[in-house]
């Protein structure tokens, strides 16, 4: 506001100021103001001198570009103005000041009233700005001497004043009134002779003579070019001053160098001492810094319960589970019974895949996962630890057990059914790298099983032996947990029924342990997945307990919805045509079921907990791509044949396992006989269809091998037939 007002006021007052400018003064042209605002490199002063009525003021106006005025108005005081001029095409901005000098000014006193009498003393008392008042040659770069060629006394003024001009100032003698040449009195030769004969010391500046006519602007170009001489002389003087300054600076620098040579800075011994002192000073802070980062790095690893271990575990898969074993159980114990504390320690070994799933699970069901987040990261750690590449990844027995343990209570079954689709989608996207959820569950189950049943697991690398050991271990783990969590047992029982007959007991035991942790939303889907797949794999073995398993899973209203859906999907070859919801759940469960079974079978032969032998990518790829039943039959027979080879040696063990599985299924069926009847019929039909679809030898091999692989987690072929059979159906 104020700036705008000032501008308005200034614009209003501008004309008044112009009016108040005294004689001999004027405001600078706007164009010149803009030009000089950028900066002025040179200030050049040109003085116009001459007798009265010789055309000084006319020349002064002409240099400004103003028109010629016929009327003669004597100038009372010195006038100064700036003109546009530049040296040829250079970018140097030169401010040229032209002075219209008055030798004797006549200043008239302006009174308020009428002048009544003449007072000579009063007139003399007043002074005007003229040549007598100041030295016009001070800082002058050029002089223009003017005379009237028709008047001799004007030339006498030149003869009198020219010698007074400083010798270093160039002078241009200009004979004006050339348009009145017929009346001329002074010839050009007379002027040149005078200039040439003028006594000037050597090195004096230049004198030039020219004629002009202000009426028709004749001679202005010559005068304009004459200004180059004062400019070049000014430039040379400026450069000389710069050279002098340069020389002075050079001398000063030489003096400084001579002094510097004698100072301590040039003493090499002192310099070395200073360098040593500096190095010591830097070394101490560096050491402190080096120590500080190590504690900093350690601190993040120690405080991080599950997530931190997940990040650190991939580098060191085995040591990571030990840390979570100590830290995870206390964290999980308050929200969940002690049975649940055991699975979390196993989980920490699978960090990377578990981490991504944890974030997804948190987004899907934060309420239910409030307690499970710590256990989830822990199981995820083991999977990645063993998996160095997609092809090398092989789920261990941990997957099946983890699925069973992760079974949530009946109340969470509905949520699990909805979440199963999301988890399946995640597992599908991650099929190549390995299903993080499946790997996490496998790790959890294996870790728990290893400490409790570690002696029986190493009993034999054979898949059948591993299966029996894993089932016994799971049964042991389940025993303490069954008491605290009866509801989860119901969920686990249908799951175990779906699974192979021998695996029913271990899943029951592990299921309660996981059920103790209701927060696992995807636990039910994962468990049910492996169980369903196992049931589909061993149709021959499932026959004895088929009726019991089906009845319990289908008739059990309290059982997890996801588990029921899985049972239908696994049993029905036409399940895809059924409800869209059932299809989604079935797809989710088979995908996870396959990884869980595969991990159990794979880990069994190599080492029960960590070393998976068979590559997971093939298994998951089949599940993801073969959800519609494409090419699963081929994978199934190949794997079944492989299992048959492996199962030939432990055929006795397989039979024993089958008997044990049948007994376990019968026990579970007795507990839930009402629910089992309904599912027995459906499962019997589905198993018949599977038998028809499967080749006879593959049925026998797959039935026995899959049971052994599922229980021991080592049979490589079991995982393929499990997922393949379901997909074929």
UniProtKB/Swiss-Prot annotation:
Q: Which residues carry this modification: Phosphothreonine?
A: 599
Give residue spans, biased composition: Pro residues.
331-351, 606-615
Compositional bias (Polar residues): 489-502
Ranges annotated as biased composition (Low complexity): 290-315
Q: What is the lineage of its organism?
A: Eukaryota, Metazoa, Chordata, Craniata, Vertebrata
| Modified sites of kind Phosphoserine | 402, 425, 427, 470-471, 492, 525, 577, 596, 640-641
Q: Where is this region: Interaction with CDKN2A?
A: 655-693
Regions of biased composition (Acidic residues) lie at 596-605
Task: Give all N-acetylmethionine modified positions.
Answer: 1
Region Small GTPase-like, annotated ranges: 39-279
Q: Where is the composition biased (Basic and acidic residues)?
A: 395-416, 581-595, 635-652, 679-689
List the biased-composition ranges (Basic residues): 669-678
Per the UniProt entry, what species is this protein from, by scientific name?
Homo sapiens
Q: Where is the composition biased (Gly residues)?
A: 711-729
What is the gene called?
RABL6
Q: Does the keyword Mitochondrion apply?
A: no
Function noted in UniProt? May enhance cellular proliferation. May reduce growth inhibitory activity of CDKN2A.
Q: Which family does it belong to?
A: Belongs to the small GTPase superfamily. Rab family.
Any idea what this protein is called? Rab-like protein 6
Region Disordered: which residues? 281-729
Q: Which domain of life is it from?
A: Eukaryota
The UniProt entry's coiled-coil ranges are none
